[in-house]
Regions:
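Flavin-dependent oxidoreductase catalytic cores
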Residues: 1-348
Length: 348
């Protein structure tokens, strides 16, 4: 009998039964090939998390539209047909241990024209966001034309289809952390005068349409997870009450919410998106708990989690249905198995 019964109770997400409530949070790697293909070492990295007992293992920030969406160098680009073999092998490596393979569909938006991290790509690419902008780097951001919006929508559907064909059992649509959909959602970023700007309903239109394209691609019952902020922590941005409203708007289109916060590309907010050791463990759980009060679909929380007792309490108390772990699983991929066996003292 495990000392953490809530943590190891199966849960059904869409038509998929997940063996426990411990998910590997989306993580990417800077060691993919220059073309964004997974190496055997990359596959082993994700496989080890599955072998260690996670219910779901997630590949992070995989780009749906390489020409306009790459925020870093060496990202998986799902519109590259040559990436399919390494994706397929990775999904097989994950699922052979009874975990579900998940992949995060993303687009960098206005941050996708910057000089790439790692320096592989030297050409200048135009950056597109909801509205014209000048970044702190001095780079000009162009307003995304409607033609490109619809091209990007097609790319989300195509990327979801690729993921399903590769053997992934779930997809995550990234709508937080300052990336494309978060930019469109934010009144601070989005000053458009067309149907994709103005009210929250209009600012959310792009996201809702993308979720519809993903559903059309994967079909009924296939789990769709949305990653969204619970608070931007930015003056003029969206806050918890706004995100409660957004959650109600998207609920019929998704099977699972992942509630995070902040922004990847703003240094003062990065610490909330990726909480350091100087912040309280589980410092963002309250956002997931608040969103859980207004929707009926399952909720996962993320950020500075790793103590099995705390994770058990989060689920037992109804604050969230699932815990997503990042650095804790990097430190010890076998954390789930050790927790199940009551070997907390052996967790790295």
């Amino acid at each position: 009998m495990t000392p953490y019964p809530h943590l190891f109770t199966p849960i059904k997400i869409g038509g998929q039964l997940i063996k426990n409530r411990i998910f590997s949070a989306p993580t990417g790697l800077m060691s993919y090939t220059a073309r964004g293909h997974l190496t055997t070492e990359n596959m082993a990295y994700y496989e080890l998390k599955a072998k260690g007992g996670c219910g779901v293992v997630t590949l992070g920030e995989s780009i749906v539209h390489a020409a306009t969406g790459q925020s870093h160098d060496r990202q998986i680009c799902l519109d590259d047909p040559h990436v399919l073999p390494s994706l397929t092998n990775t999904a097989r490596a994950i699922t052979r241990y009874g975990a579900v393979a998940n992949i995060e569909l993303s687009h960098g938006g206005k941050y996708a024209g910057l000089a790439s991290i790692g320096g592989h790509k030297k050409e200048r690419r135009p950056a597109y966001g909801p509205s014209h902008d000048i970044l702190p780097s001095g780079e000009e951001v162009l307003e995304m034309p409607q033609k490109l919006i619809y091209e990007t929508l097609d790319a989300y559907g195509a990327a979801a289809d690729v993921a399903k064909r590769a053997g992934f059992g779930m997809v995550m649509v990234h709508a937080g952390h300052g990336w494309l959909f978060n930019q469109f959602l934010s009144p601070l970023e989005n000053h458009r005068k067309d149907e994709f700007g103005g009210s929250l309903e209009n600012r959310a239109r792009f996201l809702l349409m993308a979720l519809d394209r993903v559903r059309q691609a994967v079909g009924p019952g296939f789990p769709i997870q949305i990653r969204m902020n619970g608070d931007d922590f930015t003056e003029g941005g969206l806050h918890l009450e706004d995100y409660k409203e957004l959650a109600r708007m998207v609920e019929s289109r998704v099977d699972l919410f992942n509630i995070s916060c902040g922004s990847h590309e703003r240094q003062e907010l990065f610490v909330r998106t990726h909480p350091s050791a100087f912040l309280d463990h589980g410092c963002n759980v309250y956002l997931a708990a608040a969103i859980k009060q207004v929707v009926s679909k399952p909720i996962s929380c993320v950020g500075a989690l790793g103590d099995p007792e705390q994770c058990e309490e989060i689920i037992a108390s109804g604050q969230a249905d699932i815990v997503e772990l990042g650095r804790a699983l990097l430190a010890d991929p076998f954390l789930p198995k050790k927790a199940y066996a009551g070997q907390k003292e052996d967790i790295t």
